[in-house]
From Swiss-Prot:
This is Y' element ATP-dependent helicase protein 1 copy 1. The keyword GTP-binding does not apply. The keyword Lipid metabolism does not apply. Residues 1294-1397 have a biased composition (Low complexity). It comes from Saccharomyces cerevisiae (strain ATCC 204508 / S288c). Its EC number is 5.6.2.-.
């Protein structure tokens, strides 16, 4: 160490020098600032020794593994002994407000870090633990203080601006000479931003007597006046107008330093350098400020004594600090001007000292913002790099960044590869870029005229283009909108990492605009392929003054391959996905639009097409080049191992320095090489010998060849130094033999034939019988065993034998699925060959069930066959599942025919083969006569391509099976029987599967057992089938509440009618053939998986193949069932159960249509089953009846017990004094609804249960009911006893009491429902004890007894089937409110519980989504669990007291005080996060329940309704009361609360009474119409009769006009929403062809309807997904009513004897109402004409209003929406004739569904 350095070292403030150097680590931490500023430093590498754990320095002998794990540090080398060397590294202590070192200038080059300490002296601002609690109030109520600051500044500026004209001015930093007015004119937006910046400092002023930083001021002196903070808080409370007189006086005194108030202002100004956290949206801070990494506000920390202190993690940036001072100056000037006589205190010469000091501070900060960073670069030879501003930048930094971007590119490519057969980068490079058959010889630089072929893409021969993109050019039109969007988004995302790869690969850096404008085609083209090296070369000429000559930069081979792949493959995919209608790009100055006669007439679509085919780096979503903000995000995270990240400017200077000092060694001797490197970095070369020894130099100074050579050599040096090609096996020498890389030679001399690829052949793994056993153990566990020997032998036959075609008939429930499931799993386990199999089922309803069963345990990869048809084989899926329509489709046939070619081109191997073709329930090919025309396409299928065909059925005797197979083009069954163990192939096998007879295995005949003997089959003739079916279902659910049932109806209309009428009794799912495929699958899956669903109603399609647990009953109402349909339906009862065949008396006989099987006959069902299967008849013999005709001998014990219980229940009902059916109809309906309440799931009940606070059991009594009421007492037992009476309802009501047991005892009576309702009490047990009576739905208390359906009082127990409330227990089925329990199926509100099947009742219309995506933060369960500060706990308690019902399912209307019946019609369903505009209550990284920092979260454990959710609903209430303009202004007014939902709720609650009154006043007419159903008559509207012909029409004319409008829309395929929005008749065929809601929404999104709606209407005031989500499940109740009206419409039409008219389906109907809602012109017209209605501003209210009925001119009733359409049509046309309208009535079969 030098003597001078030693002296500096001795002077350093390093007290623990000796003890630190005695440490065994080579690296020693040193906090000395002076030391590192005085002594030269170096960069050394260190590693952690695994054995000792010590930090060691990397030496020459350090091992390779330790070198890889090493890290670098800037250190000072110190010799502490003989050959003992230590290294000091600077460790900066985080400066806190209690003290701490000043940061080192060496480590913090930006002067702001010194300025906040030297100029603002923030280190002297000391905060203690009490201060932190006080500061917590600011963060807890930041929205309030933002609003307060804004209002105060706005009021002060308003008063100051109203002063008489004052000519006084002051000089400003930007206008120093003439000066500017002291009170400047400010816009409201500027005042609002200033207010956000002032909020923390306004808080400091209001708490000046509490914070320790003002301790010097707080010491009172005689005669001084203190700031009255309480008065300030009262005066500055946000109200209109704000009292600012006292505040103005305080500001004047602070400026004049009166009573030491200047000290307060002095401290507040110094505190401006502190970062109190970013403000809300629209606040201070620009993009540069927000981009600072690791920025944190003042946050709490714990010192060694356990005390909370505040630490400054990041000071304000110069730009943000300047804006804060701007706000402070504006506030001081405005506030002082309010009361001051003159403004001399702000004079530049004679002003007060405080103002001069503020000006000095401001000018220092302003000048700091204008200074550019100075880049101090030093050479670090040890690491082969440099140091830029103290940050190490070397080759490893560049390589780490580069390969991280490459990995990101590959990951995004992998996402595309999951959807497409993507060629790899190496494939494209080998096939085209390195292939010498492809020539890339062309002149460089762009041409003056735009040409289509001005791209190296056009130089690629067609034959290679076809091979490169075999999948992308096929079936493009069949790609869904979601898939297209996924493609475009993925390619947009991988564009950015590719830009970074190019940036590093060229070495000599680009400025960003130069990199941004890289183009592979067009007049600005600068991307070429060098024909010699096959690398990408870039010719760019960007310069700020436009005088730069073109620069040539060459990419390395690896980057060249990626760029070439991006242009040839990915960009073409992107163009196909965007489609011809893409028009996001506008004409910008950076693009050259040539080739058009009149550039002004060029459309956005033309411009977008040019850009896509020209420029590389695009953001197609925004319609622009990749923005710098997007590009630079990678710098914040990459490279991962770098301790300090460089920004883009530092990186640019670093790359230039690397090129100077590290890349080349000949610079000192070769001046031309050195100068070329500077020019390639766009640096000007200084003239003079002092730099390069030449007078002047430019690339024009040498010949063209020499200039090119110099630039190529510069790029070559960079490529070699960086080493990107070191592991890349595509060197320049190998490019000359690119033919070796291309797989295979041409199959013939024909030049146009496709290039064949080398295929890898592997030996086949042998099959073993053990494979089937292993597959079974994978699927069912280690204890797996086959059902019987037949099942084992069949599995081996399918898996092992060479028989190409097998047919199996087995009884329902036998396990036919496992016969092919196990062989498929065994095939998938083989590693030599990938088998792809296909399964087809007859109906869509089976699709979901099959996929669920086959994909369980993850043994098989299962996907819909639609994926294969549209996108081809993905190489991952083992089994594709589809329906018969898919099997018969031409596209599927074509895919199979081209299988070998597809596999060769895509997978480059022949080891991907077709496996099994499996057809389930194949008898339908013969028996489904009406569908046989649809099966014609199956005959074209190449069956020979499959390894084996398997046909399965439970109802296919030989005759049916043979005919079915022949109908699809196969030979049929083998004529003579074959032994099941015979594995030899016959001679006909050589002709292929289609020519080989199918081998039949008939397990029913082999076992000689009649199927369905385990089911009790009952044939009943009744007066009314629906009534009898309802009785049976109610009885079943009374006995087995968790069971399920299937009801088979004869027509689609009957299905819907039964569903509508039974929905009030139990949860129903209905299905028939007119539903869309997706809807069928969804409903089937819902019924199978949802345990709360009770009944599945459908036509015969629900009887085949569905496997349903807990199914106990099947009811047949169809009098046309044939024997196959009967067997399939009864076969759903896998484990036994009851099957009822209900027929009307004297109406069973039915004729069968031609070709169909005859219906079943009246008589013994078992004999008919035997006859069908060809079994021996036992008519008149013993054993004839098996499970039928009253025989129970073959039934299981559970089935027999179920029959007996059903019989007992029927007897009790028959002997009761008054049965339910004997009651009057209205009485019966009411009681039935109550009786079955616990199975009821209608939308009305769900709404009431949650939002109306209504109990499932009401307290009303009827007909001799007895009530026992107890008030303000403790009742151990409260009883109501009734003898010999009929109690429809017996209630025990208790108020403010604790009831241990509340009983209602009834003797010799019929209790339809017995309940106990309590208010503000705890009911441990509510029960009803009954003696010799019939209880339809009661709960009985029993002691030491066994009752399958009773309820006992249980504590800490488990009830299998109870109907009572238990505490700390598990209830399988409960119907009351439970606490701290787990309810498997409940219809009530639960607290701190888990509801496994209460989706409809626990969360309704938005709450479910809210709870799923935005759960309330549970403080006790979070990882940051801590003891909250007193301020936070106090705030939490206050909020809990202010909003006490958030533990329940509360809504804001309840909070306002509305009654439940009012809430039902004003209910705010559909209000979720998307209702709020972007930026309102949608901040991320904070608590999802209150939007506060996690340390300050005010949510409480058990809170069900978050404050954030209540804020959404409160915002919706405000929307109810405001029109569009007022609501937009309101959003601006509450902008301080956009990030503070809790503060907004407080603000909202202040106006609680006012809002309630306003809603009652504004919506009185709405409630009168919707709640009291007051009639609207068009004749009562004077303006309507005078101003519209529609109001003089009859109801029939209005209906006819409505049908005509829809007929025209349907014929022209017009987009509905757009038409009703602005009468724009835009075509959208996809909308009318959509089969389900999802496809419908995709069609609307594809044509840009939602985007236009947001841009044109008030829909932009909601979130981007709000309107789109209206088509989901928000309007289920309204949808059910509408679909029910469709059936009523059809019934009315048929009753009148007219042809039914087509009416819109639900999605089109909803589109119409949404379009009308946002049509401002129409709304104004309608509200003017129809005087009984007024404005509604929420979409749910509009939808409800549209469905009320109005009286037309002839006093006939029509829905209001029909009147709306008529008015809309009138506005579109000149006039509407008064006479009869011509309508188009489309005939329809009465049995079909009305609608689309």
């Amino acid at each position: 160490m030098k003597v001078s350095d030693r002296r500096k070292f001795e002077k350093a403030n390093f007290d623990e020098f000796e003890s630190a150097l005695n440490n065994k680590n080579d690296l020693v931490h040193c906090p000395s600032i002076t030391l590192f500023e005085s002594i030269p430093t170096e960069v050394r590498s260190f590693y952690e020794d695994e054995k000792s754990g010590l930090i060691k320095v990397v030496k020459f002998r350090t091992g390779a593994m330790d070198r890889k794990r090493s890290f670098e540090k800037i250190v000072i080398s110190v010799m502490v002994g003989k050959n003992v060397q230590k290294f000091l590294t600077f460790v900066e202590d985080e400066p806190d407000f209690q003290g701490g070192p000043i940061p080192s200038k060496y480590l913090i080059p930006k002067k702001i870090n010194l300025m906040v300490y030297t100029l603002f002296q923030v280190h002297t601002l000391k905060f203690n633990r009490k201060d932190y609690d006080t500061l917590s109030l600011f963060y807890l109520n930041r929205g309030y203080y933002n609003e307060l600051s804004f209002r105060v500044l706005e009021r002060c500026h308003e008063i100051a601006s109203a002063r008489p004209n004052d000519s006084s001015t002051m000089r400003t930093f930007t206008d120093f000479v003439s000066g500017a007015p002291i009170v400047r004119s400010l816009q409201k937006s500027t005042i609002r931003k200033y207010g956000y910046n002032l909020a923390p400092y306004m808080f400091l002023l209001l708490h000046v007597d509490e914070l320790s930083i003002f301790s010097a001021y707080q010491a009172s002196l005689p005669g001084e006046k203190k700031v009255d903070t309480e008065r300030l808080k009262r005066d500055l409370c946000p109200r209109k107008p704000i009292e600012i007189k006292y505040f103005s006086q305080i500001c004047n005194d602070m400026m004049n330093k009166k009573d030491r108030l200047g000290d307060i202002l002095h401290i507040i100004l110094r505190a401006c350098a502190l970062n109190f956290g970013a403000g809300p949206r629209g606040g201070a801070g620009d993009e540069e400020d927000r981009s600072i990494t690791n920025e944190e506000p003042i946050i709490p920390s714990v010192d060694e004594h356990g005390l909370k202190v505040c630490k400054l993690r990041s000071p304000n940036t110069p730009r943000r600090l300047r804006k804060t001072l701007d706000a402070v100056k504006a506030l001081l000037v405005s506030s002082c001007a309010c009361t001051a006589r003159d403004l001399d205190i702000f004079d530049d010469t004679n002003g007060v000292a405080m103002w001069k000091w503020i000006k000095i501070l401001y000018h220092e900060v302003a000048q700091e913002t204008t200074l550019k960073d100075s880049y101090r670069i030093t050479l670090v030879p040890s690491s082969d790099g440099i140091s830029v501003c103290g940050k190490l930048f070397n080759r490893e930094y560049v390589r780490g960044f580069y390969f991280a971007c490459k990995a990101q590119f590959d990951n995004l490519w992998g996402e595309l590869n999951n959807c497409f057969y993507m060629p790899t980068v190496v494939d494209i490079a080998s096939l085209i870029l390195r292939n010498r058959e492809v020539l890339f010889r062309e002149p460089k630089r762009g041409i003056d005229e735009y040409l289509e072929n001005d791209s190296f893409l056009q130089m690629i021969p067609v034959k290679y283009r076809e091979i490169v993109l075999p999948k992308l050019r096929r079936d493009t039109n069949k790609m869904t909108a979601a898939l297209k969007n996924k493609v475009t988004v993925a390619i947009d995302e991988l564009t950015v990492p590719l830009m970074w790869m190019v940036h590093f690969a060229v070495g000599y850096p680009y400025r960003y605009p130069e990199l941004q404008l890289l183009a592979f085609a067009g007049p600005q083209r600068n991307v070429y392929v060098d024909d010699t090296t096959r690398r990408i070369q870039l010719y760019t000429d960007y310069n700020k003054n436009g005088s730069s000559e073109p620069r040539l930069k060459t990419l390395d081979g690896l980057t060249s391959d990626y760029v070439f792949y991006f242009v040839t493959v990915l960009r073409q995919m992107q163009i196909c996905a965007l489609g011809n209608s893409y028009d996001a790009f506008n004409h910008d100055p950076w693009m050259d639009v040539v080739g058009f006669e009149d550039p002004d007439q060029v459309t956005n679509r033309d411009i977008s097409r040019i850009v896509l085919y020209s420029y590389m780096f695009l953001n197609t979503a925004k319609g622009c080049l990749v923005e710098y903000a997007t590009f630079r995000q990678y710098m914040r995270e990459l490279p991962k191992n770098a301790p300090q990240k460089l920004n883009f400017r530092e990186m640019r200077q670093g790359l230039i320095a690397l090129g100077r000092h590290c890349v080349g060694s000949r610079f000192e001797t070769d001046l031309y090489e050195s100068a070329t490197s500077e020019l390639m970095a766009n640096h000007s070369v200084q003239t003079g010998r002092n730099i390069y020894g030449v007078d002047s130099f430019s690339l024009t100074s040498v010949s063209g060849t020499t200039a090119t050579l110099l630039q190529e050599r510069a790029s070559e040096r960079w490529i070699q130094w960086l080493g990107l090609e070191s592991d890349y096996h595509c060197s320049f020498s190998s490019t000359r033999n690119a033919e070796d890389v291309v797989a295979g030679e041409a199959a013939s001399s024909d030049h146009d034939q496709k290039i064949s690829r080398v295929t890898r052949k592997r030996p086949r793994e042998p099959k073993s019988t053990n494979d089937i056993l292993v597959a079974g153990q994978k699927l069912f566990g280690s204890s797996f065993e086959f059902r019987d020997l037949h099942q084992l032998r069949l599995c081996h036959e399918i898996y092992m034998a060479d028989t190409p075609s097998v047919a199996v008939q087995a009884p329902p429930g036998y396990g036919k699925t496992e016969l092919f499931h196990l062989p498929l799993i065994a095939l998938a386990s083989k590693g030599d060959v990938k088998y792809v199999s296909f399964l087809f089922v007859p109906y869509t309803v089976l699709l979901a069930n099959c996929m669920i069963r086959l994909s369980r345990c993850g043994c098989l990869n299962v996907a819909p066959v639609r994926n294969f048809i549209e996108e081809g084989c993905d190489g991952v899926t083992d089994l594709y599942v589809g329906i018969y329509d898919d099997l018969a489709s031409t596209n599927f046939t074509d895919r199979i025919a081209a299988w070998e070619n597809i596999v060769e081109c895509t997978f480059r191997t022949n080891n991907v083969k077709l496996g099994y073709l499996i057809v389930d329930e194949f008898h339908n090919f013969e028996t489904e006569v009406y569908r046989q025309s649809q099966f014609g396409g199956i005959t074209n299928l190449d069956f020979d391509a499959f390894e084996k065909a398997i046909f399965l059925s439970g109802t296919a005797p030989e005759a049916v099976a043979d005919a079915a197979l022949q109908r699809i083009g196969l030979t049929g069954l083998a004529k003579k029987s074959m032994d099941i163990n015979e594995l030899k192939r016959s001679e006909d096998l050589s002709r292929g599967l289609s020519s080989y007879p199918t081998r039949m295995f008939n397990l029913i005949k082999e076992k000689s057992e009649v199927p369905l003997g385990h089911v009790h089959k009952i044939w009943k003739k009744v007066e009314s089938q629906p009534e009898e079916a309802l009785k049976l279902l109610l009885a079943l659910f009374e006995i087995e509440p968790e069971s399920k049932a299937i009801v088979v109806a004869s027509t689609t209309n009957e299905v819907e009618e039964l569903a509508c009428s039974w929905r009030k009794y139990f949860r129903v799912v209905w299905i028939h053939g007119k539903l869309g495929a997706a809807e069928k699958v969804s409903r089937t899956k819902e019924f199978v998986t949802d345990g709360s669903m009770r009944v599945l109603i459908g036509t015969k399609l629900v009887t085949e193949g569905i496997d349903i647990k807990q199914l106990m009953m099947v009811i047949m109402l169809d009098n046309r069932l044939n024997i196959i349909e009967l067997i399939q339906g009864v076969g759903r009862l896998r484990d036994g159960g009851l099957c009822y065949l209900l027929s009307r008396k004297n109406s069973w006989a039915a004729r069968n249509r031609k070709g169909e099987l005859p219906p079943i006959k009246e008589g013994c069902i078992t004999e008919q089953v035997r006859e069908f299967y060809g079994l021996e008849s036992k008519k008149g013999k013993k054993g004839q009846h098996v499970g039928c005709c009253g025989s129970r001998t073959d039934l299981s014990a559970d089935t027999v017990e179920l029959i007996e219980r059903m019989d007992r229940l029927a007897e009790k009902q028959a002997t009761a004094s008054m049965s339910i059916i004997a009651l009057p109809s209205s009485f019966q309906e009411s009681n039935s609804s109550d009786r079955c309440r616990k199975y009821c799931s209608s939308d009305e009940d769900s709404d009431t249960c949650i939002h109306g606070s209504a109990n499932a059991s009401t307290n009303a009594t009827t007909n001799s009911s007895t009530n026992a009421t107890t008030t303000a007492s403790t009742n151990v037992r409260t009883s109501a006893t009734t003898t010999a009476s009929i109690n429809v309802r017996t209630s025990a009501i208790t108020t403010e009491s604790t009831n241990s047991s509340t009983n209602a005892t009834t003797t010799a009576s019929t209790n339809v429902r017995t309940s106990a309702t309590t208010t503000a009490s705890i009911n441990v047990r509510t029960s009803a004890t009954t003696t010799e009576s019939t209880n339809s739905n009661t709960s009985a208390t029993t002691t030491e007894s066994t009752d399958s359906n009773t309820s006992a009082t249980t504590t800490e127990s488990t009830d299998s089937n109870t109907s009572a409330t238990t505490t700390a227990s598990t209830n399988s089925s409960t119907n009351a409110t439970t606490t701290a329990s787990t309810n498997s199926s409940t219809n009530a509100t639960t607290t701190e519980s888990t509801n496994a099947s209460a989706k409809e009742d626990a969360n309704k219309d938005g709450n479910a989504e809210d709870n799923r995506f935005h759960p309330v933060t549970d403080i006790n369960k979070e990882s940051y669990k801590r003891k909250g500060s007193q301020m936070v706990l106090l705030e939490r308690k206050k909020l809990k007291a202010q909003f006490p019902n958030t533990s329940e399912n509360m809504n804001v209307l309840q909070f306002l005080g509305f009654r439940s019946d009012e809430i039902k019609h004003l209910f705010l369903y559909g209000i979720d996060v998307y209702f709020c505009p972007e930026g309102v209550f949608t901040q991320y990284g904070l608590c999802k329940g209150c939007q506060k920092m996690f340390e300050l979260c005010v949510c409480w454990a058990g809170q069900k309704v978050s404050y954030r959710r209540m804020a959404w609903e409160a915002l919706a209430v405000e929307r109810m009361l405001r029109n569009d303009e007022e609501y937009k202004e309101y959003l601006e007014d509450i902008e301080p609360y956009h990030g503070d939902p809790v503060g907004y709720l407080k603000y909202f609650s202040v106006k609680r009474g006012e809002i309630y009154s306003q809603i009652q006043r504004n919506y009185a007419w709405y409630l009168a119409i919707t709640r009291r159903r007051e009639t609207i008559s068009v004749l009562d509207s004077t303006r309507g009769k005078q101003g519209s012909q529609v109001f003089r029409m009859s109801g029939r004319q209005i209906k006819e006009l409505y049908y005509k409008v829809w007929s025209n829309l349907r014929e022209s395929k017009t987009e509905v929403l757009q038409y009703f929005l602005n009468w724009d008749e835009k075509k959208c065929r996809e909308e009318w062809e959509a089969k389900d809601d999802t496809v419908f929404v995709e069609a609307l999104e594809k044509v840009g309807v939602f985007q236009r709606l947001r841009s044109m209407t008030s829909a932009g005031l909601q979130g981007p997904q709000y309107v789109k989500l209206q088509f989901s499940r928000h309007h289920r109740q309204l949808r059910s009513r509408y679909e029910l009206s469709l059936g009523m419409h059809l019934r009315d039409q048929l009753a009148l004897g007219v042809t039914p008219s087509k009416v819109p389906h639900w999605t089109a109907f909803l589109s119409m109402l949404i379009g009308l809602f946002y049509n401002k012109t129409f709304r104004q017209k309608l509200e003017y004409l129809l005087e009984q209605i007024s404005e509604v501003w929420l979409l749910p209210h509009w939808l409800d209003l549209a469905n009320v009925e109005v009286l037309a001119a002839d006093n006939t009733r029509v829905p209001l929406y029909m009147l709306m359409v008529a008015v809309h049509k009138e506005l579109d046309s000149d006039d509407v004739p008064d006479g009869r309208f011509d309508i188009i009535l489309l005939c329809r079969d009465s049995s079909r569904e009305v609608g689309e």
